């Protein structure tokens, strides 16, 4: 636990929390690339993938399986997913020095890849907070089923 770390401070992301296990938080990003964008954050503070415990890794994997399993059953045309993590300083894209992994559930009807959106954030509409909140509530309900 690091008192200066955003992901160690539960209050800083509690409004984004979709699911919590004994060792993992599932967070909906403040600026999602698209609706099915998730962040898996180990509760254990470690800056890099290779730094956190095997127990946390096992729990994070189980949480990923749970999310993919629940949402794949929703018949929304999911065709797979991407996992992305940045390990290093800000120059490699790791803005918070606490390991976390982004998951993008991919759909057969998507018009633009999340990688294109990540590389050109002008293509995403950050101004629509109502849509983000509606997406968050829908996802939270699906994951609770």
What is each residue range found by the language model?
Residues 1-145:
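HIT superfamily nucleotide-processing domains
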